């Protein structure tokens, strides 16, 4: 596409050079800029990428978007704008032909449950023989092909490229985990959502948002916007068991479907039966009551299942068809995942990293604990420490607790575990500044019949260490290796 055409929708301060050049790529990553690319520089929290403009010029890039004029060769066109990332969004959606308009787009937000609900929607679509894509905490997936991702919600250009990739692969729908960071930072500008789903709102990310009010407002942006095409049939799915849904209902202009277990809603779960093999319940709907069975464990997952089913139903699939698909869904990786049922202990990993998430996790497993419940939890570095003692208090619902760091980054691991220990309500706990050693200790003290829960990371494949270096780490593999060494069995898979 000709650059002059691309910039027709952009208000610029000035253009230094010619826009008469062909463009086939937009990037905010200086390492990938080349001839035919537009490089969009920006001022981030830690890096000002304007300093890489000369490097991209050396790589053959002939057009840069900047917020002030740079010292560059005369053959490099500079487009000066006030807000480079907003312009990046406009350019990306224009160049890639507004890809989110070309499929059904589901957006899932909330403190806990985003990954589970988003993954369930994707898996239901696959059971229905529909081409589907997913983007979130567990990476990027088109049908069964997976690649890793860096952020829950990538920056705007990368996100648009992923949606375009899904469209080109024939995806009929795409499900996005929508983070509060992504909403506030404008990473979702230009994305057209068909269905927005809310799980819950509990304390998290106050290091970024400052207050719960600001955090809640960030989440509400998804429901008040849902894109720019107000003529489309769009829907909102809200959890009535969370009081924040009342506010979200007031900010969205679209039709709302509500679900709940404890509070009255249009769609409800009754007569709930739970085990470590899954759940069953009566799904009470405006159209009748249906029996639902699922391999997912825990009462909180019933809420997630309902949210996913309603989202898919809202776009035209019958509930009977969806319920049949739900019975055979694969587990969501790292979410209340039971590792190797042949072991004499119940070894479980989960992503719960807030007090609310941990409470729900313990609620789910405690009825099935045969002997002791051993619970390991970590606190992330450079995060909101005000939530940490409450996490320690909740962890002490278990018989024995292990406090570790989780992605300590530049914080002192001993400080992080000490913050968790401030909330301890009994003395049956121990602190480890090395998470792997904490996991090994959990297995070492476990006896047949015990339940060991490794919380906070799920299947996250790294630890963020000083200097923000990512060091390979897998809770599941470390736990299984220790369990096989003690109890026999194996080998550990990848």
Curated annotation (Swiss-Prot):
Pathway: Cell wall biogenesis; peptidoglycan biosynthesis
Keywords assigned by UniProt, alphabetized: ATP-binding, Cell cycle, Cell division, Cell shape, Cell wall biogenesis/degradation, Cytoplasm, Ligase, Nucleotide-binding, Peptidoglycan synthesis
Positions where N6-carboxylysine occurs in the chain: 219
Positions bound to UDP-N-acetyl-alpha-D-muramoyl-L-alanyl-D-glutamate: 30, 152-153, 179, 187
Gene Ontology molecular function: any one: UDP-N-acetylmuramoyl-L-alanyl-D-glutamate-L-lysine ligase activity
One example of a Gene Ontology biological process annotation: regulation of cell shape
Cystine pairs: none
Domain of life: Bacteria
Matches recorded under InterPro entries: Mur-like_cat_sf (IPR036565), Mur_ligase_C (IPR004101), Mur_ligase_C_dom_sf (IPR036615), Mur_ligase_cen (IPR013221), MurE/MurF_N (IPR035911), UDP-N-AcMur-Glu-dNH2Pim_ligase (IPR005761)
EC id: 6.3.2.7
Post-translational modification: Carboxylation is probably crucial for Mg(2+) binding and, consequently, for the gamma-phosphate positioning of ATP.
GO CC, any one term: cytoplasm
Cellular compartment(s): Cytoplasm
Class of the enzyme per the UniProt entry, highest EC level: ligase
Recorded catalytic activity of this chain's protein: UDP-N-acetyl-alpha-D-muramoyl-L-alanyl-D-glutamate + L-lysine + ATP = UDP-N-acetyl-alpha-D-muramoyl-L-alanyl-gamma-D-glutamyl-L-lysine + ADP + phosphate + H(+)
Chain positions recorded as ATP binding sites: 110-116
Main localisation: cytoplasm
Gene3D superfamilies associated with the record: Mur ligase, C-terminal domain (3.90.190.20), Mur-like, catalytic domain (3.40.1190.10), MurE/MurF, N-terminal domain (3.40.1390.10)
Short motif L-lysine recognition motif, span: 406-409
Entry keyword Ligase: yes
Family per similarity comment: Belongs to the MurCDEF family. MurE subfamily.
Function, as annotated: Catalyzes the addition of L-lysine to the nucleotide precursor UDP-N-acetylmuramoyl-L-alanyl-D-glutamate (UMAG) in the biosynthesis of bacterial cell-wall peptidoglycan.
Protein name as annotated: UDP-N-acetylmuramoyl-L-alanyl-D-glutamate--L-lysine ligase
Lineage, broadest ranks: Bacteria, Bacillati, Bacillota, Bacilli, Bacillales
Gene from which the chain derives: murE
């Amino acid at each position: 596409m000709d650059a002059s055409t691309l910039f027709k929708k952009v208000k610029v301060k000035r253009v230094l050079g010619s826009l008469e050049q062909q463009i086939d790529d937009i990037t905010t990553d200086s390492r990938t800029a080349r001839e035919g690319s537009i490089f969009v520089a920006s001022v981030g929290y830690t890096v000002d990428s304007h300093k890489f403009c000369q490097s991209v010029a050396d790589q053959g890039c002939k057009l840069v978007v900047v917020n002030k004029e740079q010292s560059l060769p005369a053959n490099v066109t500079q487009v000066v704008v006030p807000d480079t990332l907003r312009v990046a969004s406009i350019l990306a959606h224009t160049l890639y032909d507004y890809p989110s308009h070309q499929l059904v787009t589901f957006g899932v937000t909330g403190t806990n449950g985003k990954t589970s609900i988003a993954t369930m929607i994707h898996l239901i679509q696959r059971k229905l023989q529909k081409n589907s894509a997913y983007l979130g905490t567990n990476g990027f997936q088109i049908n069964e092909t997976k690649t890793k991702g860096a952020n829950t919600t990538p920056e705007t250009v990368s996100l648009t490229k992923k949606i375009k990739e899904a469209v080109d692969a024939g995806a009929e729908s795409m499900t996005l985990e929508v983070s509060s960071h992504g909403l506030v930072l404008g990473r979702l500008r230009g994305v057209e959502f068909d269905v927005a789903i809310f799980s819950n709102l509990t304390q998290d990310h106050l290091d970024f948002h400052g207050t719960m009010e600001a955090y809640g407002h960030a989440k509400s942006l998804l429901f008040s916007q849902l894109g720019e095409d107000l003529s489309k049939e769009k829907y909102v799915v809200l959890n009535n068991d969370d009081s924040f849904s009342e506010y979200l209902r007031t900010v969205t202009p679209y039709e709302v479907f509500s679900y709940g277990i404890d509070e009255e809603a249009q769609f409800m779960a009754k007569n709930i039966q739970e085990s470590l093999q899954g759940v069953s319940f009566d799904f009470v709907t405006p159209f009748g009551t249906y029996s639902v069975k699922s391999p997912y464990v825990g009462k909180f997952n019933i809420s997630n299942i309902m949210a996913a089913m309603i989202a898919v139903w809202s776009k035209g699939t019958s509930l009977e068809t969806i319920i049949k698909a739900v019975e055979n869904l694969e587990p969501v990786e790292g979410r209340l995942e039971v590792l190797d049922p042949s072991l004499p202990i119940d070894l479980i990993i989960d992503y719960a990293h807030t007090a609310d998430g941990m409470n729900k996790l313990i609620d789910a497993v405690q009825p099935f604990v045969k002997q002791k419940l051993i619970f390991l939890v970590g606190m992330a570095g450079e995060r909101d420490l005000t939530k940490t003692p409450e996490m320690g208090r909740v962890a002490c619902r278990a018989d024995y607790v292990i406090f570790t760091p989780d992605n300590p980054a530049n914080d002192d691991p001993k400080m992080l575990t000490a913050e968790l220990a401030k909330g301890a309500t009994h003395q049956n706990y121990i602190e480890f500044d090395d998470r792997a050693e904490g996991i090994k200790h959990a297995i070492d003290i476990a006896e047949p019949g015990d339940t060991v829960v490794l919380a906070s990371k799920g299947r996250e494949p790294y630890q963020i260490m000083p200097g923000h270096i990512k060091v390979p780490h897998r809770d599941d593999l470390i736990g299984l290796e220790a369990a096989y060494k003690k109890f026999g069995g194996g080998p550990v898979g990848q």
